Amino acid sequence: MNDTEKPADTASEEEDFGDPRTYDPDFKGPVSNRSCTDVLCCMIFLLCIVGYIVLGLVAWVHGDPRRAAYPTDSQGHFCGQKGTPNENKTILFYFNLLRCTSPSVLLNLQCPTTQICVSKCPEKFLTYVEMQLLYTKDKSHWEDYRQFCKTTAKPVKSLTQLLLDDDCPTAIFPSKPFLQRCFPDFSTKNGTLTIGSQIVFQDGNGGTRSVIELRDAANGINKLLDAKSLGLKVFEDYATTWYWILIGLMIAMVLSWIFLILLRFIAGCLFWVFMIGVIGIIGYGIWHCYQQYTNLQEHPRSVLTVYDIGIQTNISMYFELQQTWFTLMIILCIIEVIVILMLIFLRNRIRVAIILLKEGSKAIGYVPSTLVYPALTFILLSICICYWVVTAVFLATSGVPVYKVIAPEGHCIHENQTCDPEIFNTTEIAKACPGALCNFAFYGGKSLYHQYIPTFHVYNLFVFLWLINFVIALGQCALAGAFATYYWAMKKPDDIPRYPLFTAFGRAIRYHTGSLAFGSLIIALIQMFKIVLEYLNHRLKRTENTLSKFLQCCLRCCFWCLENAIKFLNRNAYIMIAIYGRNFCRSAKDAFNLLMRNVLKVAVTDEVTYFVLFLGKILVAGSIGVLAFLFFTQRLPVIAQGPASLNYYWVPLLTVILGSYLIAHGFFSVYAMCVETIFICFLEDLERNDGSTARPYYVSQPLLKIFQEENLQTKQQ
């Protein structure tokens, strides 16, 4: 049976999915006679962009990024702001950190204790009563202690009066600044968590408290700081290593270029280089984790868990735990096994992958400008991300300071009500709830704009998702048009028009903005549902309802499958749009029917190639990552002058690895779109033509031959 003959069951399936393409002597690839498609969706998309710009301008007028950059004390004043009394007081200090374990921390998004700005954190244990005893002998002790008190504090007040006025903390303990806040200076001694070599301390109220309680309190505060930066040390590391990071990223770009060039000539050999390289890099990671795990067995303190040490100002402490390296080793072992199993089960399709890689290399060789297109995508995505972040920051910092009643003891019927700190002590609330505080809570307001800020946040996120998916869709459609032009050129490169990528990009923008917006809107809606689902999961993660957890897991799985299926269909729809210029729904239907009419050939499609390209990305990122690890940890004696001593070597290391992967993804995504476009055009070619002299195939003979062999084997089975 030759390739043009079809069994009866296949013919009936094709009737269900439309008629095959017929021969058209005038068809020479992407049509030039087009009209605008999905105009209504285009208009809605443009209106949303205009609204997005207006929202950004309004947020810029009302917002104040200083509220995100500086910590705010209980009076709503910024710590460290220039031109204010707190200019030299850059750190936020909590009077009673132990109160941050209260459930009201999550309810009010604020720790129920007085907070002031200080210039430095305490360096020793000292209670207020002990300070008073020392003050009678040496007045300088008050000068040290008053740094952590209000300006109205006096050293002669009794402890009872001090608690009533809330002028000073009852006790201080060794702390270090982290995220511009004073956190306990934790350390380990003989496997035990300590602060200043102590495991217990006096709280200033006559009680003895453990270090574990302080750790829990610090963790409670940390839940409120998840949107803050990692601190000054991270920026110091970036300032020291930025040029080395750029060098690493340039090496990744050159390496990606080299791989793409080599794929055209030695695709088979390079395939096995990918396989062996990825397995080797993961194997090295397993060996390194095992070595670190073995070495740490000699240190008693390494038996602590991440939960035991809690939040740390020195993140390197986590890498001093056996648990960290053991977990990383297990993860890498699982990845290694998955890669090896996939190679075993996909071994029969390696030939298809190699041929498709060669065909993709030829196409890119004839249209080299496609390798530059990822730079445009990167620029557009960067603009979208920056605008979204800036708008979100200005929205989050819009409004005026809002103060709320906080009862440290938790026994006040007026708790969580708004208040005015200027007159709070004279109000009925202060009389009804002795010890209650009127502390800064957040920035808000009662105007119409402030009431709709949560809605604006949702709109900001949704349009952001729509825009980034549109940018990706635009790139896929433009690349598909360029590669389709290559495929349908009978004599290459003579029949390939000049500037195919520029022409395809212009067609996509001029005629098909609405169709691309339609497809990206569907993906954005699915992603919004996923985000809402994750939000609900976060709110309900402490529930013990097994049914609820099961339903959440099922919904996650369903949305993940739906998103990937829609993305696959959208890519093929964009290819059809690039070739025929029809609207999104018609193009998606045509692409789906084409794939279903050729379901046997789809069984040997380019999915294996995607896997190979993914391994190529891992190989590039892993190779640069290993080199960066050896360099930033000063284990490369070949380079005499490396980076200076770093606070956290993993900061530039992770940046280089992530950046290298994104660069490799940008280059290899062009390859992936090329392969998918060639495959769709190949299916159309088989339906339009029969290989005769009058109707010759446009596909190359090696690719045609291997697909005919695969189809024959499938039919025989």
Curated annotation (Swiss-Prot):
Gene Ontology molecular-function annotations: antiporter activity; choline transmembrane transporter activity
Record localization: Cell membrane
Signal peptide interval: none
Residues spanning the membrane: 39-59, 243-263, 266-286, 326-346, 352-372, 375-395, 461-481, 516-536, 611-631, 650-670
Cytoplasmic side: 1-38, 264-265, 347-351, 396-460, 537-610, 671-717
Region Disordered: start-end pairs: 1-24
Reactions catalysed, as given in the entry: choline(out) + n H(+)(in) = choline(in) + n H(+)(out)
Domain of life from the UniProt record: Eukaryota
UniProt keyword annotations, A-Z: Antiport, Cell membrane, Glycoprotein, Membrane, Transmembrane, Transmembrane helix, Transport
Segments on the Extracellular face: 60-242, 287-325, 373-374, 482-515, 632-649
Membrane topology: Multi-pass membrane protein
Transmembrane is among the record's keywords: yes
Biological-process GO terms, alphabetical: phosphatidylcholine biosynthetic process
Alphabetical list of InterPro entries matching this protein: Choline_transptr-like (IPR007603)
Glycosylation sites: N88, N190, N314
GO cellular component: plasma membrane
Family of the protein in this entry: Belongs to the CTL (choline transporter-like) family.
Purpose: Choline/H+ antiporter.
Name under which the protein is recorded: Choline transporter-like protein 5
Natural source organism: Macaca fascicularis (Crab-eating macaque)
Gene: SLC44A5
